[in-house]
């Protein structure tokens, strides 16, 4: 390769050919590079790679386990999705005349080995490019690569990350520290959202990129990279496929994954086209709090997290649909009629993703600290329950061993809280659970049980197919009230189930034990079921009945006079405004540890541009039935996740007791919805979306 100029492109969460600034630059400018070597590195601290070790040898890296709970950093379902993303972009690069290597190791180790191998063959690297990322571990990787390049006299450049909705260079923030601490404040500075994104960049034409090198150094020992996808996936999943708990849930008969999609750039675009053509984007605002099926939300969050599609590409296709300029979208409901509530809601949530990332830029390693963003003020005093003896308060009650059992049951989905258990089983078996369910699961762990929120964030990191560092950790802080939520709040999971699992289908689908239980209040909290029915279904000795982790008082109660009908309400609630939820129990100290929980050193070298699916985000919403869907409205919640902060006084929650006694359960739920329609809350006249908590889409 004498006389040639080799550019090494290190990919991370930019696994796409379309709207890729680096590829676009190489395809359209006079850059002088003769060869391009794209490399995707599997980082052993973030994903377990011991399956690739040659037989008889040992991995030089420790297990890829989380710091607090010792969960896998990447579980089998996300590992499979990630493998599909890697292999798909590899094929796409090949289709435009390039290619992509897959390597294992720390970024600087891989680069050093590549330089050494090339030098031994009298070859060299001219420049290394990569796209910037703001998280601590990613910053460390950037710093390490920049250091190697500086020592070896190799050029290095960090490219601006352009996979987000509004480009950082256009959001008006001169410095990340200027990011408002409240999302609404930031949102107001960016509207109207439809006018803000930059246009996406086209896919490079075949043959427009520098040549792929003909000679490539092998993978450094002791690892090997197979040439076919099936073997690659098998080796990646082998170390992490065993269940992390005893007696894990089995896949229920008749249940289906809400996220059956393969990973990759190609499936991402297929999904986007389907959403627009089917009209699902138009109805998104009405359906986004759904629990079952593939169509209630976009399911684009996993693709966005891996960078297989960009937010501005999604926006650009929505504009074509709204303007009526793309004929292939003409059968989609709302075609050519401008922005609608659904497409506006999608943009709103894409902006949330931008904001969560900006918060990472601003707060850095506070994203992972137990006192969260609010700890920056120095006034955070909350103590959390922990299962770690070394971190627990001397008088912690329950004990660390008891907390460990509570966490195991939370993971297994045997807490006794139907909505929570259904979500946890769905997550463990499919790698996905809905936005609304994530909020309730997080609130239950942090507010009802008072357990260290980082354990929840780490478990979601392991389990979620659509895991995104900024959204996941930021959302868990939000639910734990140590993030950028201006108010402390908590959910009543029984009421939430009545609101969003109105016929009990979701809970019954994933929790086999309650499949044949008739009354919804017993489905949603099995310990309230009468003894005779428990005996009938063989549930008398079930741990969810005999020892629920946290019983939540919620029942049908009789009013004091004849002026009001019977209604669903939390026992003890007098209809006054909530003051915000509080997590119970004493607990551990900060336990900051090391690794990504500590501040990184700044990058030394290179051109750095200065520029947070559940995760468990979403909104406190109460629905109003409309023709063709369940119209969701955005509200600020009080301590029970209710609109308006006024307890249960709103007539939209009331039930006629006589009709309850006379009607079957499914008719009762229809009547419940009808009451909401007849008595809409006055604040439903306000604009939508504006008070949501962090979402995934």
Swiss-Prot record:
Instruction: Provide ranges: composition bias, Gly residues.
Output: 578-590
Pfam families, sorted: DNA_photolyase, FAD_binding_7
Compositional bias segments (type: Basic residues): 560-569
**The keyword Flavoprotein belongs to this UniProt entry's keyword annotation:** yes
Q: Which PROSITE patterns match?
A: PHR_CRY_ALPHA_BETA (PS51645)
Name the segments for region: Disordered: 170-215, 554-697
Presence of keyword Flavoprotein: yes
Any single GO molecular-function term of the entry would be: FAD binding
User: Which cofactors is this protein said to need?
Assistant: FAD; (6R)-5,10-methylene-5,6,7,8-tetrahydrofolate
Task: Quote the cofactor binding remark.
Answer: Binds 1 FAD per subunit. Binds 1 5,10-methenyltetrahydrofolate (MTHF) per subunit.
Q: Which domain of life is it from?
A: Eukaryota
Q: Which GO terms describe its biological process?
A: photoreactive repair
Point to the regions of Basic and acidic residues compositional bias.
188-198
Q: Where is the composition biased (Low complexity)?
A: 659-675, 683-697
User: Which keywords does the record carry?
Assistant: Chromophore, FAD, Flavoprotein
Report the residue ranges that make up the Photolyase/cryptochrome alpha/beta domain in this protein.
Answer: 5-164
Described by its record, this protein's role is as follows: May have a photoreceptor function.
* UniProt record similarity statement: Belongs to the DNA photolyase class-1 family.
Name of the protein this chain belongs to: Putative cryptochrome DASH
């Amino acid at each position: 390769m004498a006389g040639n100029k080799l550019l090494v492109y290190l990919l991370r969460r930019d696994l796409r050919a379309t709207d890729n600034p680096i590829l676009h630059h190489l395809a359209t400018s006079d850059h002088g590079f003769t060869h391009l070597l794209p490399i995707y590195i599997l980082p052993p601290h973030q994903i377990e790679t011991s399956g690739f070790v040659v037989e008889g040898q040992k991995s030089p890296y420790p297990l890829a386990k989380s710091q607090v709970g010792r969960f896998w950093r990447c579980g089998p379902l996300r590992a499979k999705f990630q493998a599909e993303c890697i292999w798909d972009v590899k094929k796409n690069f090949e289709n435009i005349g390039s290619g992509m290597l897959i390597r294992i190791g720390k970024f600087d180790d891989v680069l050093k080995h590549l330089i050494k191998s090339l030098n031994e063959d009298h070859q060299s690297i001219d420049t290394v490019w990569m796209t910037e990322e703001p998280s601590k571990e990613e910053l460390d990787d950037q710093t390490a690569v920049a250091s190697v390049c500086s020592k070896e006299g190799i050029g290095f450049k960090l490219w601006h990350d352009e996979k987000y909705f509004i480009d950082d260079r256009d959001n008006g923030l001169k410095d990340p520290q200027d990011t408002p601490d409240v999302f609404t404040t930031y949102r107001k500075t960016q509207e109207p959202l439809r006018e803000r994104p930059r246009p996406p960049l086209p896919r490079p034409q075949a043959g427009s990129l520098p040549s792929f090198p003909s000679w490539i150094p092998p993978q450094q020992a002791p690892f090997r990279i197979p040439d076919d996808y099936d073997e690659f996936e098998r080796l990646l999943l082998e170390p992490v496929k065993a269940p992390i708990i005893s007696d894990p849930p089995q896949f229920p008969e008749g249940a289906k994954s809400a996220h059956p999609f393969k990973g990759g750039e190609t499936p991402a675009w297929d999904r986007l086209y389907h959403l627009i053509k089917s009209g699902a984007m138009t109805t998104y605002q009405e359906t986004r709090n759904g629990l079952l099926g593939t169509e209630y939300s976009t399911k684009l969050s996993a693709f966005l997290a891996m960078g297989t599609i960009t937010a501005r590409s999604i926006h650009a296709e929505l504009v074509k649909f709204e303007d009526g300029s793309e004929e292939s979208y003409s059968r989609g409901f709302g075609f050519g009629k401008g922005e609608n509530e659904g497409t506006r809601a999608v943009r709103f949530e894409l902006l949330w993703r931008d904001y969560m990332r900006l918060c990472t830029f601003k707060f850095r390693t506070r994203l992972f600290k137990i006192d969260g963003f609010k700890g920056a003020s120095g006034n955070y005093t909350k103590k959390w329950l922990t299962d770690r003896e070394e971190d627990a308060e001397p008088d912690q009650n329950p004990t660390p061993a008891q907390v460990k059992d509570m966490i195991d049951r939370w993971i297994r989905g045997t807490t006794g809280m139907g909505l929570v258990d259904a979500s946890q089983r769905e997550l463990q078996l499919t790698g996905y659970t809905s936005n609304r369910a994530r909020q309730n699961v997080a609130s239950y762990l942090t507010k009802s049980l008072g357990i260290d929120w980082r354990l929840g964030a780490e478990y979601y990191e392991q389990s979620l197919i659509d895991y995104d560092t900024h959204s996941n950790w930021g959302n868990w802080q939000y639910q734990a009230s140590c993030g950028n939520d201006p108010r402390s709040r908590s959910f009543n999971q029984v009421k939430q189930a009545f609101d969003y699992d109105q016929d009990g289908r979701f809970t019954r689908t994933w929790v086999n034990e309650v499949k044949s239980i008739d009354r919804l209040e017993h489905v949603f909290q099995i310990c309230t079921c009468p003894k005779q029915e428990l005996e009938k279904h063989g549930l008398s000795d079930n741990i969810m009945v005999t020892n629920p982790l946290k019983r939540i008082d919620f029942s049908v109660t009789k009013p004091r006079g004849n002026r009001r009908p019977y209604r669903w309400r939390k026992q003890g609630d007098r209809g006054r405004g909530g003051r915000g939820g509080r997590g119970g129990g004493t607990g551990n100290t900060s336990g900051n540890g090391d690794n990504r929980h500590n501040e990184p050193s700044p990058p030394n070298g290179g051109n750095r541009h200065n520029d947070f699916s559940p995760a468990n985000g979403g909104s406190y919403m109460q629905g109003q039935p409309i023709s063709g869907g369940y119209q969701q409205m955005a509200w600020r919640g009080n301590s029970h996740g209710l609109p308006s902060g006024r307890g249960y006084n709103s007539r939209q929650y009331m039930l006629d007791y006589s009709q309850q006694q006379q009607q079957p359960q499914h008719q009762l739920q229809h009547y419940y919805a009808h009451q909401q329609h007849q008595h809409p809350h006055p604040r439903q006249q306000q604009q939508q979306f504006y008070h949501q908590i962090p979402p995934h889409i």
